[in-house]
């Protein structure tokens, strides 16, 4: 007789005091160049592929977790949230209201704009990113126009595209179209009729979100030939209605199936803080564009940290919204269970304004997910500091410090301590069991859903047109079985229970955003790509709950490591708790403002 299967304790009976944190130990080869090509041939081979994927899954406990374990919980195929208490000190925006009206309402939640603080006379001020309200002030006061700023952007894009090495932030850029958009905005200002505070604001769109008339390729070489773009994605249409100007389609890790940003098709986006290092991904181009100063904000997608990871590595803000808070209609992946469209921005204030414009659930999500009312924090409320002082921050210390270099966790801890000493917040120790099971369930969930979307094209002869690292991922994803998928959804229910229990004690959960700072780009990866699951696991270590459970999360820059590379602190919130995250993130941003550094590759488009 065989050995009886492992059985997990029912989730309600798990003794948290007996839980011991185990640092993950991922086993997979690091491959570039010819070795990557050979590995892909083996993975796709009918003779060797099944054996190789079986070994990889066995070595990384995937088979044991999903095939050899009895999991007593029911599957959770979509995030399921209990009713949430109303957030304090917020302004309701209304899910179905016009985005222009919502942005106008959100504007009243921000401190009054003082040009003297943003445009000081005399000595050169410390480095600050220009904010959306700085551009609005410059346009309204006649300092500059959207057309002038557009020319600075065009010059910056051309300059960095011709650098050695080049910095390919965009996969589609049309200077004439940008000039046309800017001219229309300039006329509105000349006539005294700007549409909103976002009129004339330049924003980039990740290449897996439709922005008419540009194609959506997902940074492949072929997707625009099999899928046409007839109109804007919903989130883009909402921004366009506010007067936003779109600078083009931003580079990304091909089809979002990686978190470094490597892309041999269009060139790998480079980190503005150190051009020999990755931006992180998959929203690599959006992060590089915002970090380098070429736009105030960008829209990316986040299915496995793809907004938060590059935002952290590039030293900017990345907000991942609750699953179902933003309408994914018009994105290449608009029917998965882990992905959302969300903003990257130079400041929390700008993230708040862009979020106010794009938020709003689609009708089906309103029926199934029952989102809490859409709101933003009232940062000028007399109670704002008191609300901040009442915040309880959850911290799983052993997990928090499981990073490649203690510079990362110590810097994040310093930011939390500064927040607590400034406002009176409390840090509470929490325990989150089964983090490795969570990682496995996420890999199987996003992998199976991606493979389901791409397999028809794969089988129709497009296999060799994918990059090698995408083909590696698809070969692994295609080996997952229905049993693996259902078992992963059972794990999803367990992990949701643990987080719901933690949120009975705390308001937000704090972690470093990534387990490493920006990794170096191997020269050998530029032509054929790279497969490095160990580095990817470090980058994704803390972000997965946001996707598997659909929870909102935000990353805020809080300092740099010894090499001068940005470090991000992540805050994970309750379902639909974006307002609370934005409030706490705004306070942390202000406390750490002097620690931000001008990227070595930076273009001042407002004061060029």
From Swiss-Prot:
PROSITE patterns listed in its UniProt record: AMIDASES
One GO cellular component term noted in the UniProt record for this chain: endoplasmic reticulum membrane
EC top class named in words: hydrolase
Family as reported in the entry's similarity comment: Belongs to the amidase family.
Activation/inhibition comment: Inhibited by methyl arachidonyl fluorophosphonate (MAFP).
Name of this protein: Fatty acid amide hydrolase
Positions bound to substrate: 303-306
Residue positions of the active site: 206 (charge relay system), 282 (charge relay system), 306 (acyl-ester intermediate)
Alphabetical GO biological process terms: lipid catabolic process; N-acylethanolamine metabolic process
UniProt cross-references to InterPro entries, sorted A to Z: Amidase, Amidase_CS, Amidase_dom, AS_sf
EC number annotated for this UniProt entry: 3.5.1.-
Quaternary organization: Forms homodimers.
Name of a matching Pfam family: Amidase
Keywords (A to Z) from UniProt: Cell membrane, Endoplasmic reticulum, Hydrolase, Lipid degradation, Lipid metabolism, Membrane
Broad class of the protein's primary localization: endoplasmic reticulum
Location of this chain's protein in the cell: Endoplasmic reticulum membrane; Cell membrane
Signal peptide: none
A molecular function GO annotation: N-(long-chain-acyl)ethanolamine deacylase activity
Catalytic activity of the protein: N-(9Z,12Z-octadecadienoyl)-ethanolamine + H2O = ethanolamine + (9Z,12Z)-octadecadienoate; N-hexadecanoylethanolamine + H2O = ethanolamine + hexadecanoate; N-dodecanoylethanolamine + H2O = dodecanoate + ethanolamine
Cited function: Catalyzes the hydrolysis of bioactive endogenous fatty acid amides to their corresponding acids. The hydrolysis of endogenous amidated lipids terminates their participation as lipid mediators in various signaling systems. Converts a wide range of N-acylethanolamines (NAEs) to their corresponding free fatty acids and ethanolamine.
């Amino acid at each position: 007789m065989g050995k009886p299967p492992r059985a997990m304790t029912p989730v309600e009976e798990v003794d948290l005091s007996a839980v011991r944190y185990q640092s993950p130990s991922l086993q997979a080869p690091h491959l570039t160049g010819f070795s990557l090509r050979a590995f892909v041939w083996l993975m796709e081979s009918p003779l060797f592929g099944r054996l190789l994927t079986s070994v990889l899954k066995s070595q990384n406990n995937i088979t044991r977790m999903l095939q050899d374990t009895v999991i007593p919980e029911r599957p959770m195929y979509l995030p399921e949230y209990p009713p949430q208490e109303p957030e304090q000190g917020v302004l309701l925006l209304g899910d179905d209201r016009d985005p222009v009206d919502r942005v106008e309402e959100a504007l009243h939640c921000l401190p009054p704009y003082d040009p003297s603080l943003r445009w000081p006379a005399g000595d050169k001020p410390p480095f600050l990113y220009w904010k959306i309200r700085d551009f609005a002030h410059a346009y309204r006061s006649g300092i500059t126009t959207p057309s002038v700023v557009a020319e600075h952007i065009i010059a910056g894009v051309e300059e960095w595209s011709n650098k050695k090495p080049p910095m390919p932030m965009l996969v589609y850029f049309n200077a004439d179209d940008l000039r046309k958009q800017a001219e229309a905005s300039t006329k509105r200002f000349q006539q005294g009729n700007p549409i909103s505070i976002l009129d004339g604001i330049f924003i980039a769109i990740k290449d897996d979100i439709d922005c008419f008339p540009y194609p959506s390729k997902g940074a492949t070489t072929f997707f625009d030939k099999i899928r046409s773009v007839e109109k804007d994605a919903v989130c883009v249409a909402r921004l366009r209605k506010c007067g936003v100007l779109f600078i083009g389609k931003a580079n990304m890790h091909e089809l979002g199936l990686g978190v470094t940003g490597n892309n041999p098709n269009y060139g790998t986006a480079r980190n503005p803080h150190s051009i020999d290092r990755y931006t992180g991904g998959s929203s690599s181009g959006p992060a590089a564009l915002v970090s380098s100063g070429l736009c105030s904000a960008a829209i990316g997608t986040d299915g496995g940290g793809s907004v938060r990871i590059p935002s952290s590595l590039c030293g900017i803000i990345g907000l991942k919204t609750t699953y179902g808070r933003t309408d994914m209609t018009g994105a290449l992946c608009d029917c998965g269970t882990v992905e959302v469209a969300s903003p990257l921005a130079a400041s929390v204030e700008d993230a708040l304004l862009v979020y106010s414009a794009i938020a709003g659930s689609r009708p089906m999500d309103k029926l199934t997910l029952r989102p809490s009312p859409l709101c933003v924090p009232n940062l000028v409320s007399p109670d704002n500091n008191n609300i901040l002082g009442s915040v309880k921050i959850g911290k799983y210390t052993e997990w928090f410090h499981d990073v490649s270099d203690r510079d990362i966790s110590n810097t994040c801890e310093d930011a939390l301590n500064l927040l607590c000493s400034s406002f009176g917040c409390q840090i509470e120790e929490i325990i989150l069991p089964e983090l490795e099971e969570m990682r496995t369930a996420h890999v199987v969930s996003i992998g199976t859903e991606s493979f389901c979307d791409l397999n028809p094209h794969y089988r129709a002869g497009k296999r060799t047109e994918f990059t090698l690292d995408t083909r590696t991922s698809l070969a692994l994803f295609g080996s997952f079985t229905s049993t693996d998928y259902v078992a992963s959804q059972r794990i999803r229910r367990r992990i949701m229970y643990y987080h719901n229990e933690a949120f009975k004690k705390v308001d937000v959960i704090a972690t470093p955003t990534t387990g490493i700072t920006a990794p170096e780009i191997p020269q050998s990866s530029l032509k054929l790509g790279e497969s490095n699951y160990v580095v990817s696991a470090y980058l994704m270590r803390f972000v997965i709950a946001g996707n598997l459970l659909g929870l909102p999360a935000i990353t805020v820059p809080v300092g740099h490591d010894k090499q001068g590379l940005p470090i991000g602190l992540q805050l994970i919130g309750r379902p639909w708790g974006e307002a609370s995250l934005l409030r706490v993130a705004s306070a942390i941003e202000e406390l750490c403002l002097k620690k931000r550094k001008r990227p070595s590759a930076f273009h001042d488009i407002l004061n060029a």
